[in-house]
């Protein structure tokens, strides 16, 4: 039986007020993702898929190779961290998705990116 790689994904998001224009329905958010390899062998992140949903229910799908122009190799016990951004038409939304990855044998697998909230500070209680 092949052991599934153990990967932990954590995301922290912030509202970028200086780049947002609420009166034009432009709300900018930055998010920092940490991908930790908790397994015993190397893994490589090859691609990503995002489902972005605003508070009106409008969904946008984004997919592509790597993240921020990289396809990082993550050694056991190490992590890869990056920051990216999203622009919504509403002050509240969510993002979720998965990473396409391969293990040290070249076997493909997916790692879930748990849903996280994008919200301006006034909406967070």
UniProtKB/Swiss-Prot annotation:
<protein>
    <recommendedName>
        <fullName>Protein ApaG</fullName>
    </recommendedName>
</protein>
<feature type="domain" description="ApaG">
    <location>
        <begin position="1"/>
        <end position="125"/>
    </location>
</feature>
<dbReference type="InterPro" id="IPR036767">
    <property type="entry name" value="ApaG_sf"/>
</dbReference>
<dbReference type="InterPro" id="IPR023065">
    <property type="entry name" value="Uncharacterised_ApaG"/>
</dbReference>
<dbReference type="InterPro" id="IPR007474">
    <property type="entry name" value="ApaG_domain"/>
</dbReference>
<dbReference type="Pfam" id="PF04379">
    <property type="entry name" value="DUF525"/>
</dbReference>
<dbReference type="GO" id="GO:0070987">
    <property type="term" value="P:error-free translesion synthesis"/>
</dbReference>
